[in-house]
């Protein structure tokens, strides 16, 4: 028997497609029939960059005042009970805390970029604190 060249053909065998559930079929056909428009979505990263620009321009405090005040009072309880705070003292603490956090995140971002990443990780924060000479 002579050898013949084989050509690729589409397969007709295999499993038959399963029937869709009624709800899935209804869901697929509904948007086409009703013409419901999908909400607009920005590309990933666009909104993040917009927020970065917005917060770099602003000078207002980003942590809410009352939760920060509760945290300060809770931490102060460990050292001495019945402490009282002037509102300006809590405001100064909040300003200092936010300035520290912003600075730490800047250094953390530099550490992530140095590692050829764009996402910060806990090890970046640890490295930034270590380079600053802070205890971790």
From Swiss-Prot:
Residues recorded with modification N6,N6,N6-trimethyllysine: 5, 28, 37, 80
Ranges of Low complexity composition bias in the record: 22-33
A Pfam short name: Histone
Subunit composition and interactions: The nucleosome is a histone octamer containing two molecules each of H2A, H2B, H3 and H4 assembled in one H3-H4 heterotetramer and two H2A-H2B heterodimers. The octamer wraps approximately 147 bp of DNA.
GO cellular component: nucleosome; nucleus
Gene3D superfamilies in the cross-refs: Histone, subunit A (1.10.20.10)
Modified residues (N6-acetyllysine): 10, 15, 19, 24, 28, 37, 57, 65
Keywords annotated in UniProt: Acetylation, Chromosome, DNA-binding, Methylation, Nucleosome core, Nucleus, Phosphoprotein
Protein name: Histone H3.1
Residue positions, PTM Phosphoserine: 11
Location of N6,N6-dimethyllysine modifications: 5, 15, 28, 37, 80
SMART domains (alphabetical): H3
Native source organism of the sequence: Mycosarcoma maydis (Corn smut fungus)
Reported function: Core component of nucleosome. Nucleosomes wrap and compact DNA into chromatin, limiting DNA accessibility to the cellular machineries which require DNA as a template. Histones thereby play a central role in transcription regulation, DNA repair, DNA replication and chromosomal stability. DNA accessibility is regulated via a complex set of post-translational modifications of histones, also called histone code, and nucleosome remodeling.
């Amino acid at each position: 028997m002579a050898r013949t060249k084989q050509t690729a053909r589409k397969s007709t065998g295999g499993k038959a497609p399963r029937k869709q559930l009624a709800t899935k079929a209804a869901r697929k056909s509904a948007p086409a029939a009703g013409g419901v428009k999908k909400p607009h979505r920005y590309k990933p990263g666009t909104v993040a960059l917009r927020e970065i620009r917005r917060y770099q321009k602003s000078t207002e405090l980003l942590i809410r005042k009352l939760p920060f005040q509760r945290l300060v009072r809770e931490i102060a309880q460990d050292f001495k009970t019945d402490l009282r705070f002037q509102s300006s003292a809590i405001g100064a603490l909040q300003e200092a805390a936010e300035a520290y956090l912003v600075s730490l995140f800047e250094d953390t971002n530099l550490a992530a970029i140095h590692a050829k990443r764009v996402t910060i990780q806990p090890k970046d924060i640890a490295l930034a604190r270590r380079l600053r000479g802070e205890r971790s």
